[in-house]
C-alpha cells in the first residue's frame, strides 16, 4: 500500500464531531459527487476506488442526515479491473446539497467554500481532511521529492481551498492549472508535516518525519563525503603538481640551485609525497613551520618551475 493510501486509510477511521461532519462531507461530495436527474428527482453518485472512503461517506451520511443511501460496487472493464464503489443518494439529495452549501435553491453550483461550513477551526481542519480524501495525493517521502497536492475540477474551489490553507494555517500552498482541472500543492517538507497534523493523520505524520530525518541525515552525510572527497582530490592534485614541478627543476637546473629553505621543502616533498602540508611543516629541520608557511614556499617553487618552462630568468633573491 502506498504512503498516500495508508494516510487516507488512517483518516477514514477518525471520529468526527457533529459540527465537523458537515464540513468533511461537503468536501467529499463537492469534489467526488456526480449530479444527475432520474424520474423527476435528483440523484447524487459519489464514486471512488477506495472502499474505506466509500464506507466513510456512507457512514457520515447515515450519521448526519435522513436520506436514502445505497452502496453499489462496479467492476472497471478497462486497464486495471479494480472495483469502483458508488455511494448513491436518492431521496432528499437536493436538500442535502443545499445544507452542505454545494447547491443553491435554483440548482446552480456554489463553487467556493462557504464560510458557514468552516466557522470553527476544527471544521476548517475537517474540510481539508475531506478535500484530501476526495482529491489528495502525497508522494512517498522515501523515494521521491516532497510533494502533496489536492485536485479540484473548478478554479474557484481550488483558489478557495488554497486561501483556506494559507490564511488560517499558513501553509504557503500554491495553485497550478492542470489539463483536466486545478491543483493546490505543497512542496516544503515542513508544510506537508503541518498539513498531515492539521487533518489528523498523526501516524502518517510520524512515519513521514522518521523518513524525513533519515533522509536529511543521509543527504548531510553525502554532502560531507562529497566535500571531503573534493578537498582530498584538490590536495592530491596539488601534491602531484608540486612533485612534477620539483622534478622539472631538478632536471633543468638542479635542486641545489634553490635557496636553502626552498631546497629543503622540495626534498621533503619528494620524500613524503602523500603527507599533508601540516605534516610536512613538522618535518622541517630547525623547528615546526605552519601550514601557510609551507604553502608559501611550495608556491614559490611552482613559480620557479613555470618561469623555467617559459624560458624566463629566475631571480632566486626574490624567491623567498
From Swiss-Prot:
According to its UniProt record, what is one Pfam family this protein matches? LAGLIDADG_WhiA
Keyword Cell division applies: yes
The task this protein performs is described as: Involved in cell division and chromosome segregation.
Gene3D superfamilies under this entry?
Homing endonucleases
Q: Which GO BP terms sit in this record?
A: cell division; regulation of sporulation
User: What's the protein name?
Assistant: Probable cell division protein WhiA
Q: Extract the DNA-binding region annotation as residue ranges.
A: 276-310
Keyword check for Cell division, yes or no: yes
Gene of this entry = whiA
UniProt record similarity statement: Belongs to the WhiA family.
Keywords of the record, alphabetical order, are:
Cell cycle, Cell division, DNA-binding
Molecular function terms in GO for this entry? DNA binding
- Superkingdom assignment: Bacteria
